[in-house]
């Protein structure tokens, strides 16, 4: 058994992969295994993987048919042997002390999760650290999950990406956590991170930027996002169902409806390339019992009062959210969508 399993999904990254792998193999901490998952790549990435594996015994290879990013990460999790799990995207690269610093933080504080910063890198060069937070250890049992979501997740002070954290594999395996299929939900990182949070007692936050998040014009995040509204609504439903299944729903009742509305559902409606798809998704989801419950909770007083207190948004935002939920529940999907779409010129 090693201390860390580093999982790298690989697909169409021939030009970026050597820099990524070099940065991992150059870590000042060497008690790790590197799991490279070939997700059916069609370029020369598989040959690059094989060449590196011949040079370093810490590298383990998986070759599989293309199944998407979630499928590749799950394949890596299935064979991981480390006490901790770290994900690195194959077009990014990392600082030499990432593993040393995060393992030390986890071991010295007893944190279930170590969260760290990153910087964007594009044609203009490397930018400043993207997120703004302090080094700290957060005891979620003292703070409360609802306050953590409002204080750190809602304003995006702490990232939700898979590759900005060190996880305990024991928690992942104990609760059977895996990434949902990309075809079914958007922002699979968000769902996994939220589910993991429900089993987290302590977080160690490191403000240093350890990951160089490389911006590519042909990356998954840069492409158009078909069925975005439906996939984010599905994410919302699954998060609510999971919180209920593990007995944490009551603890986050004041934040969960607002989180799903403000950060997921509204985002899906605003940025889905097809309003027809938005309306169809809303009609289909209107019959979902979990979505109905979420919308009724959104109309309640407490979630929206907490929303205003923590975000500084005024009474108009509360009224809009309640009206959105009321219209959707009563079948007026066009009227509900119009409240949050914000673009008059959409066809």
Regions found by a protein language model. Give the residues of each.
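Short, well-formed alpha-helical segments that are part of the catalytic scaffolds
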Residues: 12-26
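Donor-binding/catalytic cores of nucleotide-activated saccharide
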Residues: 69, 90-204, 211-227
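Glycine-rich, basic loop-to-helix element that forms the pyrophosphate-binding segment
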Residues: 64-80
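Catalytic core of nucleotide-sugar-dependent glycosyltransferases
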Residues: 208-217, 222-250, 262-291
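Short aromatic/hydrophobic "clamp" motif used to bind/position activated sugar donors
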Residues: 85
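A conserved acidic beta->alpha catalytic loop
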Residues: 30, 38-47, 65, 89
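Membrane-interface aromatic/basic loop that binds lipid-linked glycans or pyrophosphate carriers
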Residues: 111, 241, 269-347
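Cell-envelope/extracellular polymer assembly enzymes that use nucleotide-activated donors
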Residues: 2-5, 23, 33, 191
């Amino acid at each position: 058994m090693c201390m860390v399993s580093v999982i790298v999904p690989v697909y169409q990254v021939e030009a970026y992969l050597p820099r990524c792998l070099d940065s991992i193999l150059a870590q000042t901490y060497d008690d790790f295994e590197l799991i490279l998952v070939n997700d059916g790549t069609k370029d020369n990435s598989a040959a690059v993987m094989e060449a590196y594996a011949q040079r370093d015994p810490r590298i383990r290879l998986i070759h599989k048919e293309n199944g998407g990013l979630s499928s590749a990460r799950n394949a890596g999790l299935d064979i991981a042997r480390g006490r901790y799990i770290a994900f690195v995207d194959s077009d990014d690269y990392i600082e030499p002390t990432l593993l040393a610093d995060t393992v030390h933080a986890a071991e010295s504080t007893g944190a279930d999760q170590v969260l760290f910063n990153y910087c964007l890198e594009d044609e203009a060069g490397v930018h400043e650290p993207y997120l703004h937070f302090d080094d700290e250890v957060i005891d979620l049992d003292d703070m409360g999950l609802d306050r953590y979501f409002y204080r750190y997740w809602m304003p995006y002070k702490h990232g939700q990406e898979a590759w900005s954290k060190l996880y305990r594999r024991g928690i992942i395996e104990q609760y059977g956590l895996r990434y949902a299929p990309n075809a079914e939900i958007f922002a699979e990182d968000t769902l996994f991170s939220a589910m993991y949070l429900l089993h987290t007692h302590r977080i160690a936050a490191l403000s240093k930027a350890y990951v160089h998040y490389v911006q590519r014009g042909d990356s998954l995040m840069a492409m158009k996002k078909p069925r975005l509204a439906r996939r984010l609504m599905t994410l919302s439903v699954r998060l609510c169902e999971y919180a209920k299944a593990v007995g944490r729903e009551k603890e986050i009742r004041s934040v969960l409806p607002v989180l799903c509305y403000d950060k997921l559902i509204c985002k899906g409606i605003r940025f889905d390339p097809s309003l027809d798809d938005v309306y169809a998704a809303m009609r289909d989801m209107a019959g979902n019992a979990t979505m109905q419950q979420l919308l009724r909770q959104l109309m309640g007083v407490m979630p929206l009062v907490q929303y205003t207190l923590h975000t500084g948004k005024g009474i108009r935002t509360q009224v809009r959210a309640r009206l959105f939920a009321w219209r959707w529940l009563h079948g007026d999907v066009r009227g509900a969508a119009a409240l949050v779409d914000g673009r008059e010129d959409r066809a």
